Amino acid sequence: LGMFSNLAKPAAGDWARWRGPDLNGISSETGWQAKWPDDGPKRLWKARVGTGFSSVSVANGKVYTLGNSGRGRGDEKDTVFCFDAATGKQIWSHAYEARLDPKYYAGGPSGTPTVDGDRVYTLGKRGQLLCLGATDGRVVWQKNVATETKAKSPTWGFAGSPLVIDNTLFVNVGARGTALDKKTGKILWSTGRESSS
């Protein structure tokens, strides 16, 4: 994970979920440097987060992401990381058991954390859904949403990123769309088939 000078300026808007504030992957920021030096922008910091394909979310001066510590030794864990956006100092991390599961790729988590106010939501490859405190990483609630909805895992595991609209948290697990109360984790409804491709 590396942060570059144009991405970590205090004036920059938050990017608190996958594809940004408008869910279109387009930044509304202005004044971006159109031409970079041959060796690229100045790196402000970098951090080791393990294996995975999670993007980063930026909110309130903090950067959140996921990675897996596994090397096929049987002690694999997914970890949610929170860093100071300006310095790269790790503020907190929360780890839970999760297989690396390298199937046709390196493995690790694929979903991006979603920050909503003082909460961070993450979805792991096997359906582990977590709600953590954004400032301290404490577990507010957690559940395996795939188990509870009887969703079957796709070949590469679940890769969706949570979406918050008002008081509802939406996740995609396989062929199921599921809505939960964002404060309690209670499942409000779930749709779809029990199998996924």
Language-model segments: residues:
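Noncatalytic, solvent-exposed loop/strand surfaces
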Residues: L1-S197
